[in-house]
Amino acid sequence: LECAQIGEVTDTGRLEYFRHGQKVADIPAFSLVLGGGAPVYDREYTRPAYMDEIKPYDPPAPADTELVSIAHRIMNSPNIASKRWVYEQYDHTVRTGNTNTNDPSDATIVRLKDTDKSLAVTVDCNSAYVHADPYIGAMIAVSEAARNIRCSGGIPLGVTNCLNFGNPYNPEVYYQFVHAIKGMGEACRKYGTPVTGGNVSFYNQSVLKDRTEPVFPTPTIGMVGLVEK
């Protein structure tokens, strides 16, 4: 990958900035780290009531005579049916770096020209899992991404994220956010995949009749891995 060296790591615990050889800034790194010296919001949050309501859910097993019709309904649902008709319209040969074909693949493989290495890239999240349990659901999202990388022959290297939630001033929504972050962090530590960046999108909600409904919590995980020849 093309890159430019912009500095070096030291053991001073400080960030020093230089311009034309002259030091122009000297800042304690601790003061810039969330959870360290940087300000952190400490909002009120409460466990959503629906989590206790859905926990004991145990749907009855369908009768044998209903299995075929149930399978048809499931496979016809836009949430379940294949999305190939959408993503296969993209020209995957752009810039001649993508080694994938239209065959099923757990991750996209992008070759690094002039090397014997490639990158495996995947994006994953099942918001229904996160809605049911934000902590475990976020761990599942990271785990799915790691599996996709490994099943494509790669070694997981790092993570970025796109965190989509409702109104953070809603204590139940903020609970989802807090516990999804904790679950994501726990899984990333397990896989040794640092979170190099990401973004947070709040206030994703819709007004339905007389109530405001937030979207399902969706901490989308983007993971990259290294595939060696």
Over which residues does each language-model region extend?
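Glycine/proline-enriched, intrinsically flexible loops and inter-domain linkers
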Residues: 1-229
